[in-house]
Each structure stands twice: as C-alpha cells, then as structure tokens.
Amino acid sequence: MNVKKILLRKRRKKESLFKYISGLLHLWLGLLSSLVILVVCLTGCMYAFKNQINDFQNRNQVFIETKSEKLPLSYFEDKLKKENQQINSILIPKNPSRSVVISFFDIDSKNIQTHYFNPYTGEDLGSGNGNFDGFFNTVEALHKNLLMGDVGKHIVGVFVLVFIFMLLSGLVLWWPKRKKKLVKQAFTIKWKAKFYRINYDLHNTLGFYSLAFLLFISVTGIYITYPWVKTVVLVSLGGESISEQTQSQEGVSDSFANLMDEMLKKENEKMDVVEIKQIPLDSILYLTQKELSYPGTTTILLPDEKEPRYRIQKINTSNWLGAMLPDIIDFDRNGELKRSDLFKNKPLHQQFKELSKPLHTGEIMGTSSVIFYFLITLIGFSLPITGFVIWWKKVK
C-alpha cells in the first residue's frame, strides 16, 4: 500500500492550486474526522424518531377511539381534586384520536406525575412506559458530547466545523467543467457498474443531493455550541450580537422598564389571589380559542404560588409549510388577557432562536420532516464510509 503517495499526491496537469489544496484537505480531514462524524450522524438518525418510538411503545395510552363528544376539562379537575391531586398543566392534542396529557401534583406523596387521560370517557390510562428513556438519553449525550461532558461538546463542535468544510470542499472537487457533464454527474448513479464505481457515484451524487440540507443541520447544531456562531446567525437575521445584547442589558432601556412593570403587575396579582375567584379551565380554553381560532395542540399551564397567570401555548400549523409555530398568551385568574406573544409578530432573529432546536432535529413539520431528516442524516452517515472506500481502493 502506497499510503504516503496518496496522502501527498502530486498536483495534476491543469489542476488549479485551489482545487489541489482542497483535495488534500478533503482527504486528510475526512480521515481524521470520519469516526466522530459517523457517531454524530448515526445518533442523529436514531434520535430523530424518539417521539414516534415513545408513542408506539405507549400506543395503548396515547391513541384512543374517538367519540362524538369530549368531556369538559372541569371533569378532570374535579376528578383529580377528589383524589387529593392538583393539576399543574394539561396538554390537549390537535389530533382527536390522541389522549389528553395531564401533569399534576400529588399532595399526599408530594410528587409530580404525568398521566394520559381519555378525553371522551375520562379514564386514567396511566403514566405510560419509559423503557426507552435511558436509551435515548444516552443517544442524545453521544450526539452532543460523546459522553465526555464539556470536552466532548467542543470535540463534536470542532468536527462539525470540519464536516462543513468537507461538504464545501467536496462540492469544489465534484464540480465539473462542462455543463452537460454537470447534469449527468449530479443526478445519475451507474447501478450496473462495478462495486467501486457505484460507491464512487453514491459518494458524489448523494453528497450533492444532501449538501444544502446537511449544511443547514450542521450550522443549526454548532449554533447551540458556539456563541460566535450564534452571533453570526442572529446578526445576519437582523438581531444583535451576544456581546451587544449583554451591553444593552446593562443600561435602563424601554424593554427593561416594561419588564419591571410586568413583574410589578404579577406581584400585585399574587397579592390579590385571595380576592379573585379563579375561573374554570373550560373558560380558559374558550378564551384561548377566541384569541387563537385556528386548530392546534394546546398546552395550558395553571397558576401557582410563583406564577399567578394561566400560560397557554398553542401550536399553529396554518401556514404553507405546515411548520409548527408556537403562539403564547397569558390570562390572569379572572380571565383577562395579559399578554399575547404571537410568533408571526416576532422579528426574524427571534423566530429563529425559538425554532433552532426543531429546525435542527427535524421536528419542525412533524413526522414528515423527521423522516426527511432521517434520510438526510443517513446520507451524512454514509459519506465517511463511501469516502473511505474510495481512498482504500487507491492505496491497495
């Protein structure tokens, strides 16, 4: 095997210096980063279906038979109150064939529990099965930091940056001089050819198809890891850099004054709790539907000692992409609207901040986008393998 000759190959005739250097770096960095990229892509593929797998293993609790009328929310409130339990939150799915999910505080055991309830019969379906929770926690940790804490987090971040360079340098190496050849190379795989030729076409063609999507997934990943990446993204979307945000918070601004005013109002609401009769959950749901009239999964957080208001998040999918966009509204205990924080009214950089995780994981459009992301990350997983096979053939 002539490894040295391959790693330090001579520049070809008519090959530009830029393409020559790109080729060497693509090879060296590919060999160096392949193992980490394999782990990150594989765990990303596996983690993509976490919610779907959890729903499947708890299918007897999650999915129920639909009937004509749902029970009022007050039924569940009264039912739990009789059992010395106090509701903290309630999730009402958009899909009528899914159970209501209620988190409640058990006064006797002093524990917070989450159970599925049939919205048509009122039956308590239990807390479900969490057998895969530990597995997915490990998969997530491997994906984020290779089970090595902060050190692993930075290792993953560096190699994702390397992967981004690999994608771009791969495009440089792949780009043909002739336009006719461009179309042929971009969209064809010679399936009847020999193994090494098919492997070569898979590396090039699948890499071309997935390039933009893998770049996007990679950037949204390192956005979480590195503040400077977050700054670049936010500034490019019209926001402030992280340092500028910190500096602006040091002075008294209108937004700070508004925040203080909001906090004072909440403190006054806490003091008035005894005098105010709390309206029922069904009224809150009615008011929510009045403010946010579209169909969508709704989560209601009930008031407590620290938070005197109802906080409602409703997922809006009424857009041309079907993306899951969160709208948030607050009501006080007597049903007066105190805050309306609609996704469509937020600046672009703030919208991106709120959607950065579902954009990275593929949950942004539900199961369809999760499947698409799975296929893209599967291609990302294959690139180091097919690339290594190409290199191995040359050194044999």
What is the role of each PLM region?
Residues 2-396:
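Conserved histidines in hydrophobic membrane contexts and catalytic metal-binding motifs
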